[in-house]
Amino acid sequence: MRKAPLLRFTLASLALACSQALAGPSPYSTLIVFGDSLADAGQFPDLVGGTPGARFTNRDADGNFAPVSPMILGGRLGVAPGDLNPSTSVGIQPDGNNWAVGGYTTQQILDSITTTSETVIPPGNPNAGLVLRERPGYLANGLRADPNALYYLTGGGNDFLQGLVNSPADAVAAGARLAASAQALQQGGARYIMVWLLPDLGQTPNFSGTPQQNPLSLLSAAFNQSLISQLGQIDAQIIPLNIPLLLSEALASPSQFGLASDQNLVGTCYSGDSCVENPVYGINGTTPDPTKLLFNDSVHPTIAGQQLIADYAYSILAAPWELTLLPEMAHASLRAHQDELRNQWQTPWQAVGQWQAFVASGAQDLDFDGQHSAASGDGRGYNLTVGGSYRLNDAWRLGLAGGANRQKLEAGEQDSDYKLNSYMASAFAQYRQDRWWADAALTAGHLDYSDLKRTFALGVNDRSEKGDTDGEAWAMSGRLGYNLAADTSNWQLAPFISADYARVKVDGYDEKSGRSTALGFDDQERTSRRLGVGLLGSVQVLPSTRLFAEVAQEHEFEDDEQDVTMHLTSLPANDFTLTGYTPHSDLTRASLGVSHELVAGVHLRGNYNWRKSDELTQQGISVGVSVDF
C-alpha cells in the first residue's frame, strides 16, 4: 500500500543529488544561508532516527530527512555539496555555509552574522536554552562577505511563535530586524541577497481555524510590509521571494502543484506533530504520501513545499540568463539582414544609368551554448529581403533595401519560447575604381517581440509567464578592399578591412499574470563595435556562372557581461539587477555563394553564411534573384 507514494517521495528526495549533476548556469561562487528552521540543513542531532542531523521536514521510508529549499536550490546552482552543510552542526562535518538554526528569532539570525552563532535548543523543548555548539558569527572579527556569493535569508516566524510579536508595532520591529541582517551582509560586502517574505502564519495547521488565525494573518502582513520597506533602502541586489503569494496560489489550485485537491491542506499535516495528521496522506494514513500535502507538521512544509520554494527561487535567478538573449536575437536579425546585402553585392553591376531590383529569401539557425550566467538556446529564423540599386557612373552604385525577419528562440532548461519579428530598412553605397573597392550600409529596424513565454519548473509541473514588448535597432557597416587581380581576370582575390557598429534597445515590459512568479524587466541595450580583416574571392567557372567565397576575423570591443534590472510584478518597488549573457571578443565568419545569369540582366544566386564565436553559432542559407532594367 505504501510502495508507490514512498517511491514518489524517494524520487523527490533525490532532487538534490540529481540537480547537482544537472546543474545549469550559475554566476555565484557559492550559496550562504541564514535563517531559522525553514532553512536549517541539520544543525541539531537526530535523537530519533540516528541520521547525522535533524531537519524540520518529513522523513522518507528509510528515515532520512527531505532536503530544505536552500539545499535543493544550491544543487541546481551547482554549489559544492559540502557548502550546503550546516555551519554549526553537532553531527554533520565538515562545516558548511548554512547558518540557519531551528528556533532562531530575527535577533539570533542577526547575531549569527555579526557576533556569535549558537546551536541552542529553542524554547518549548526539553533542555531549552542549552547551547550544543557555538562559533563566531559569519562576519565576526572583521571578516568580509564573499561578493560573488548568493546569500539566502529567511526568518521571523519564531518571533511570533515565541511570543515576541503581539502587536503591529512588534511585527514592524521584527521585520526591520530581519532587514538588518541583510543590511549587515551588504555592509560586509555581499551583493546578491535573496530574502523570503514571511509566510502567512494564519494559514498554517498551528493556527488555521483558531481565534488567532485572522490576527496572525494581519500581523504577518505588517511584518512583511516593514521588511519590504527596509529592504528597498539597502544598496545591494535584494531579491525578494513572495512566499505568501506563492503558497496562496498553491492552496487555491493544489492539483496544479501535485497536491491533494480533496484535502484540508492547512488544517492537516503529514507527521501529526502538533497538528492533525491527514487521514489519507499522513504518515499513518491510508495512502501515506508527503508529496500530496503542504505541511509536515504545524508550521513546516513537506518536501512538496520545499521543492516548490526552491523552484520559485531558481526561476527568478534563471530569468536573466534567458532574457539577456533578447538583444542577441535582434543582433542576429541585423547580421542576417547585412549578410543578405553583402550577398547581393556580389552580383554583377548593371549598366550605368540602369536600375537593378532584387528579392531574396533565406533561413537561419542560431545556437547559444550555455555560459556561467546565460542559458543555452536554439533559434530558427526566416527572412524576406527586397530592394533595388541605381548605378550612377562607373565607380558608384547606390541602393535601398527592406527586410522582414521572423525568429524563434527556445532557451533554458524548460524550453522557454521567445519570438521576434523584425523589420529592417537599409541605404547602401558601393564603390569600385581600378582595383580599390568599398561598400557601406546604414540600417534601422523596428523590433516586435510579440510572444515572450518564459517557462520554468514549479513543483511537479511547469509554469509559463508571458509578455510582449518592442524595440529598435541601428547599424552602420563598411568594408574597404583591394583586388589583387585585374577586373578582366577570371579570378579575384581581395583582402579587406571592415568596421561595424550596431545598437539594439529592447523596451522593458511586465509579464501579465500578476502571479508570484511574474517578473518585470527594465529596458535592455546592447551595443556592438567590431573591427575585422578578411579575404573576398571569386572565380568564373562558366561564362554565366561565378563562385564567391569570403572569410573574415572580427574583434568585438563591447564584450562586457550583460545584466538586466528586474522586479516581481507583485513587489514593483523592489528591483534588483542580475547578470546574464556575455558577448565574446572574437568572431569568425565565412560565406560561400554562386551567381548564375539566367538571361541577359537576370541573375539567380544562392548563398551560405556562417558565423562562430566561443558559444555562438549562426548560419543561414538564402536564394535571390535580381533583374536589371
Curated annotation (Swiss-Prot):
Question: What keywords does the record list, in alphabetical order?
Answer: Cell outer membrane, Hydrolase, Membrane, Serine esterase, Signal, Transmembrane, Transmembrane beta strand
> Any ranges marked Extracellular in the topology annotation, and which?
24-381, 406-421, 446-472, 502-530, 555-588, 612-619
Query: What Gene Ontology cellular component terms go with this record?
Result: cell outer membrane
* Signal sequence, renumbered to the chain: 1-23
The reply on keyword Transport is: no
Q: Which parts of the chain span the membrane according to its record?
A: 382-392, 395-405, 422-431, 436-445, 473-484, 491-501, 531-541, 545-554, 589-598, 602-611, 620-629
**Can you supply a Gene Ontology BP term from the record?**
lipid metabolic process
Question: Domain of life of the organism in this record?
Answer: Bacteria
Catalytic activity of the protein:
a carboxylic ester + H2O = an alcohol + a carboxylate + H(+); hexadecanoyl-CoA + H2O = hexadecanoate + CoA + H(+)
Its record classes its membrane topology as:
Multi-pass membrane protein
According to its UniProt record, where is this protein located? Cell outer membrane
Periplasmic-side stretches of the chain, per the record, are: 393-394, 432-435, 485-490, 542-544, 599-601
Output one GO MF annotation: carboxylesterase activity
Q: What is its EC number?
A: 3.1.1.1, 3.1.2.2
List each copy of the Autotransporter domain by range. Answer: 350-629
PROSITE patterns noted in UniProt: AUTOTRANSPORTER, LIPASE_GDSL_SER
Question: Which residues are catalytic?
Answer: S37 (nucleophile), D297, H300
- Name the SUPFAM superfamilies for this protein: Autotransporter, SGNH hydrolase
Q: What is known of its domains?
A: Contains a C-terminal autotransporter domain that integrates into the outer membrane and enables the translocation of the catalytic N-terminal domain to the bacterial cell surface.
Q: Which PANTHER family match?
A: GDSL ESTERASE/LIPASE EXL3, SGNH HYDROLASE-TYPE ESTERASE DOMAIN-CONTAINING PROTEIN
Family assignment from sequence similarity? Belongs to the 'GDSL' lipolytic enzyme family.
- Role description: Esterase that catalyzes the hydrolysis of p-nitrophenyl esters of acyl chain lengths C4-C10 and Tween detergents. Also has a pronounced thioesterase activity towards palmitoyl-coenzyme A.
Q: What is this protein called?
A: Esterase EstP
Organism of provenance: Pseudomonas putida (strain ATCC 47054 / DSM 6125 / CFBP 8728 / NCIMB 11950 / KT2440)
